[in-house]
Amino acid sequence: MDNKRQEQLQHFWEQFHLPAIDLEGLDLALTHPTYAFEHHLPGDNQRLEFLGDAVLGLVVATYLYQHFPQLPEGDLTRMRAAVVCEASLVKVARRLRVGDLLRLGQGEEHSGGRERPSNLADAMEAIIGSVYLSGGYELARDFVLQIFTPALEILSDTSFIDSKSALQEFVQSQGTENVVYKILEEWGPDHAKGYKAGVFLKNRLLATGLGHSKKEAEREAARAALALLKVQG
């Protein structure tokens, strides 16, 4: 790696104010298969992408498990998927200008590869993988939580006073039809009932919520659905 490239990567990493990492690994994370092929390099970022995908999933799953103790597994799964999906990764990559750092083959470069969503998402996962290999799980966790702060803050926002109205306003602003609430389960004696509500959009279950009354369960379902829709953007 020449000095210019090293300075470029060092500048990128310093913005996070985290312990130093192996810049060779970061460079590999930004190496597209077409570049590796054209320059006869022994590796590209695909294996790091595989590793980073697993690390990202674990970090986000742990965060959701700790911050949403009342949510069932199905909602946690949907929330994790919203955070780690390609669209979310691309948002992060563009905010960090990862495309400027990619090493691409000539054909990929000339066909818009620096802004191609799949390239940006793959590179973000590969970067996470390289951080994990360089500094271990704790450093990778700190990195992931920092770069995904906007998405995680949306999920953690419990300030929706009237979550049902807020959800309805949001879906109407997107030009879609009204949401529908259904009580999916109820249990317990009359003096201590528990309810599970689901909120549906176009017959698709968005999220569920639990409560001691039907209205409380519906509000919790609306809050979870609103967070998911905002993250998916």
Curated annotation (Swiss-Prot):
Q: Offer a single GO CC term for the protein.
A: cytoplasm
What positions does UniProt annotate as the active site of this protein? 53, 125
SUPFAM superfamilies in alphabetical order: dsRNA-binding domain-like (SSF54768), RNase III domain-like (SSF69065)
Q: Which residues form the signal peptide?
A: none
Has keyword Disulfide bond? no
- Return the Gene3D superfamilies for the record: 3.30.160.20, Ribonuclease III domain
Catalyzed reaction equations:
Endonucleolytic cleavage to 5'-phosphomonoester
Give yes or no: UniProt keyword Cytoplasm: yes
* Similarity remark: Belongs to the ribonuclease III family.
Q: What is this protein called?
A: Ribonuclease 3
